[in-house]
Amino acid sequence: MTTSSYFLLVALGLLLYVCQSSFGNPHTRDSGTTPDRDHSCGGELVDRLVKLCPSNRKRRGFPSMLKARAKRNEAFLLQRDGRVIVGDCCDNYCTDERLKGYCASLLGL
């Protein structure tokens, strides 16, 4: 990949991120709402997945890799399974046991 192609790809990615954040994301909690213990949205949900899901990969690099992947596209992992996790854990009540049920499909284990 040439330098100009790489630059164009990065610029388009940043433009997409700005457009998405300026129109709002329905899967992140408003700043005016108080966080519940069992309701998690966006980065909070990714953090819960990192803590709850077992991994066969190296422990040192896996959480940071998962967080970086999610931050690239505002909860990319949450969009993979048809917003089912968002419905269970962001919009509604979600227990840790229920969230553990999504580990295999989300992390490809």
From Swiss-Prot:
Q: Which InterPro entries match?
A: Insulin-like (IPR016179), Insulin-like_sf (IPR036438), Insulin_CS (IPR022353)
Q: Which cysteines are joined by disulfide bonds?
A: C41-C90, C53-C103, C89-C94
From its record, what is one biological process in GO terms? Answer: glucose metabolic process
Question: Where does the protein end up?
Answer: Secreted
List the propeptide residues: 25-29, 57-83
UniProt modified residues of type 4-carboxyglutamate: E44
> GO MF annotations for this entry?
hormone activity; toxin activity
Residues of the signal sequence?
A: 1-24
The record's Gene Ontology cellular component field reads: extracellular region
Give expression by tissue: Expressed by the venom gland.
Spell out the Pfam families in the cross-references.
Insulin
Q: How does it assemble?
A: Heterodimer of A and B chains; disulfide-linked.
Entry similarity comment: Belongs to the insulin family.
Main role?
Answer: This venom insulin, from a fish-hunting cone snail, facilitates prey capture by rapidly inducing hypoglycemic shock. It is one of the smallest known insulin found in nature and lacks the C-terminal segment of the B chain that, in human insulin, mediates engagement of the insulin receptor (INSR) and assembly of the hormone's hexameric storage form. Despite lacking this segment, it both binds and activates human insulin receptor (long isoform (HIR-B)) with a moderate potency (EC(50)=373.2 nM).
Protein name stated in the entry: Con-Ins K2
Which organism's genome codes for this protein? Conus kinoshitai (Kinoshita's cone)
Its ancestry begins with: Eukaryota, Metazoa, Spiralia, Lophotrochozoa, Mollusca
